[in-house]
Amino acid sequence: MAAAAAVEAAAPMGALWGLVHDFVVGQQEGPADQVAADVKSGNYTVLQVVEALGSSLENPEPRTRARAIQLLSQVLLHCHTLLLEKEVVHLILFYENRLKDHHLVIPSVLQGLKALSLCVALPPGLAVSVLKAIFQEVHVQSLPQVDRHTVYNIITNFMRTREEELKSLGADFTFGFIQVMDGEKDPRNLLVAFRIVHDLISRDYSLGPFVEELFEVTSCYFPIDFTPPPNDPHGIQREDLILSLRAVLASTPRFAEFLLPLLIEKVDSEVLSAKLDSLQTLNACCAVYGQKELKDFLPSLWASIRREVFQTASERVEAEGLAALHSLTACLSRSVLRADAEDLLDSFLSNILQDCRHHLCEPDMKLVWPSAKLLQAAAGASARACDSVTSNVLPLLLEQFHKHSQSSQRRTILEMLLGFLKLQQKWSYEDKDQRPLNGFKDQLCSLVFMALTDPSTQLQLVGIRTLTVLGAQPDLLSYEDLELAVGHLYRLSFLKEDSQSCRVAALEASGTLAALYPVAFSSHLVPKLAEELRVGESNLTNGDEPTQCSRHLCCLQALSAVSTHPSIVKETLPLLLQHLWQVNRGNMVAQSSDVIAVCQSLRQMAEKCQQDPESCWYFHQTAIPCLLALAVQASMPEKEPSVLRKVLLEDEVLAAMVSVIGTATTHLSPELAAQSVTHIVPLFLDGNVSFLPENSFPSRFQPFQDGSSGQRRLIALLMAFVCSLPRNVEIPQLNQLMRELLELSCCHSCPFSSTAAAKCFAGLLNKHPAGQQLDEFLQLAVDKVEAGLGSGPCRSQAFTLLLWVTKALVLRYHPLSSCLTARLMGLLSDPELGPAAADGFSLLMSDCTDVLTRAGHAEVRIMFRQRFFTDNVPALVQGFHAAPQDVKPNYLKGLSHVLNRLPKPVLLPELPTLLSLLLEALSCPDCVVQLSTLSCLQPLLLEAPQVMSLHVDTLVTKFLNLSSSPSMAVRIAALQCMHALTRLPTPVLLPYKPQVIRALAKPLDDKKRLVRKEAVSARGEWFLLGSPGS
């Protein structure tokens, strides 16, 4: 029995010896993994592996010893978690001893120590022992890169798990690491080494007397000068090294006396990258430095920064210089001073003011902006700095404004003033009387009002911005100042067309200031606008002149712009709605553009109300019933219908009202939306008009039952409301509503109504939760579509219903969407519906504005376009190849629409297979196909030049042909593509250069300015092709 057991035990050991022999002597690599796997599975122990290695570990031949230790180390790397404490002790002693061995053995020894540094069972004291042995026995920088990396890994492992033990070494550990790192050149190792240095400092290891040595061993790499080789497999970028080294240099104030002179030297050098790196590093240092570290270097730092901002041609250097100055000032501002200490901030700011003040007064104003930027960078660092600089600079700038008479000079000075005023907004003052602006308020207001009355538009624009900033200062402006300001803004809001930018700025400023000073604007602006509106109504009655018409439009825009406070909305909204009623009641010459302008103002007001729940609900419950009442009244049959009533039912006007209702509904809370829906749905289904103002109508409102097209057209307003509701709002009588919508969607007598019904049905389908009721609605829709698509007068309406239902399901990833898309694809071959089906793919891929929007709470999956592309483009391509010649353009059009709206990163990998079809689409006579395809190709020329250059001959020919297209939009797009072609590799393009330059001479004489502009741009790029520096 004993003999049998011995044989069984000997058999596996024999296998182990065989594997060891194959690795050590046979130089095979595979056995190491096998041995490690056997140890992990429990077939062998580490001790048995050591015994099997036996004499190989003591072999007089270094290479044999190295192979034996390599095998043991590889086993330990895989199995270090299995080791017991006593095994770790013996292995550590063995490996430490082998550090004295032949240099060929050292790499394998280090691998073993790396494995042991990961052991949880490592007894206390051994980490210190290992590192001492490495520091003493190994000349690390003579090792290959991979072995140096192993040493850094050993140190990192011990720092992570044995921090207190290593700290017991005191400064000896720091000195040992300095020796290890000294002379390191490989970027892979430097990243690890910099991280170790950072940890030494941030985790409070003792640096002892070696602070300067540690600084020297890291700062010698500053600034980083490293360019990664092409196709670098390690992926290390120069920026990685820069940031890692910067983290070290800026990690401790103890480096300051060595680092600051170095930074000053590099800022003053001629190397742009060194300047940038130094200024960014200085910026980082200021976060940890105090006055003590900066004190002796402040004059030199200021001189260097000043010189760079004054003299540099690089915007990046200027920006970094200003950022560094800001950080320096912030650092000096936050330092706590002793009572007897010098206030370095005060003296530093005095130097800045002394060097910059006189430039603000120079007649030629050459260094005005650099000086202002420096002063603003310092002033923006702290409240104390801001007060000091502002109180010194503002009197000077105010004086200069009055000294200079030219508008351009005054604009420059006012822009500088504006910069300093904006900085004041950063700081709050408990005692408003201490605010430095108080003493200059009257002068500032006077200066701003002068700017607002200046003939120069540019000066007026700066004046408006300055007024807005002054107004944002709490309790600065008096009531009289505000009254004057409102008067100026009123005047500027009615400027002529050539001052459009000023008018827009004035409207924006009115909105900003009205939110802060609602009483002033209610008292002084709203009454004036109300009067202006009344005058506008009178002019409409008389048949107005164009100038009066434009004033009326300006008034409407001003009313919406100023509606930024709940109290003002309660005044301005009734004015606009009353205006609509007045137009309705009077004998005014109402045009659709007038009503659309009012609706646009209402929509803008609704957008502003979205920020405040109270205003949002007020607008909704006030404006929506009013608009619905006007529309319902307009839809009623009358013997002599008024002009307005006809206007209110026009497509464009209804679309404008849809926009108002949708905007006013999207931000309602579910509770308030639920209140509203109980009124509006019954209005359309049951004719319940009780909640409408002035609801005495001559007949019942029954849009679904009534035969009049006027009432049916108002389904668009129902759509705007119900399709903007939050998803969790329950819609009353939903089943009846969906059936009525479905029935109306296939009514051929009024395309506008049927389309609105189809969109409304689709919008509700998209939000409806999955379940039996949704399935029933879908089945009804499919049956209706199939019935309508047969022969008959409703084919077009059935197709529209199919399209919108498909879109609703595509957006939410509903399983039926693939069947409906396939049905749509089948219609591409239909003689009557084929072109419309092709355009339908544009609708499926586009964002809508009135229904199925994220803002309207529709269920829109993030990557629906990518999914649609993956699921359907192969079928489109296949269908194109199989289609008869007369149908192919429909497939090309559909494909072009899909690709044009696809995110380019998704399209690029598929480009080689699809490009031939896109090029064929350029030959399609349909302008829509051409434009869509050109829009798709232009970004691809910029992002995939290598693929596109394979087809350069075809591209040049087709783009040049299309540059003479009858369609202006196609001509412009073709010329933009010709411009983009110049991004392809120059050698590929040069043979075509003469031909292209000749061909592009023709569109230079195009009758349309925008075409000529693109032609000049494209031809200029082709002229430069191949020239030096291009």
From Swiss-Prot:
Keywords: Acetylation, Activator, Chromosome partition, Cytoplasm, Cytoskeleton, DNA damage, DNA repair, Nucleus, Phosphoprotein, Repeat, Transcription, Transcription regulation, Ubl conjugation. Gene3D superfamilies: Leucine-rich Repeat Variant (1.25.10.10). GO terms for molecular function: enzyme binding; nuclear estrogen receptor binding; protein-macromolecule adaptor activity; signaling receptor complex adaptor activity; transcription coactivator activity. Disulfide bonds: none annotated. GO terms for biological process: chromosome segregation; DNA repair; protein maturation. The modification N-acetylalanine is found at A2. HEAT repeats lie at residues 866-904, 908-946, 949-987, 990-1028. Ubiquitously expressed with higher expression in testis. GO terms for cellular component: centrosome; cytoplasm; cytosol; cytosolic [4Fe-4S] assembly targeting complex; membrane; MMXD complex; nucleoplasm; nucleus. Ubiquitinated; undergoes 'Lys-48'-linked polyubiquitination by MAGEF1-NSMCE1 ubiquitin ligase complex leading to proteasomal degradation. The modification Phosphoserine is found at S1027. PANTHER family: DNA REPAIR/TRANSCRIPTION PROTEIN MET18/MMS19, MMS19 NUCLEOTIDE EXCISION REPAIR PROTEIN HOMOLOG. Key component of the cytosolic iron-sulfur protein assembly (CIA) complex, a multiprotein complex that mediates the incorporation of iron-sulfur cluster into apoproteins specifically involved in DNA metabolism and genomic integrity. In the CIA complex, MMS19 acts as an adapter between early-acting CIA components and a subset of cellular target iron-sulfur proteins such as ERCC2/XPD, FANCJ and RTEL1, thereby playing a key role in nucleotide excision repair (NER), homologous recombination-mediated double-strand break DNA repair, DNA replication and RNA polymerase II (POL II) transcription. This is MMS19 nucleotide excision repair protein homolog. The lineage of its organism: Eukaryota, Metazoa, Chordata, Craniata, Vertebrata.
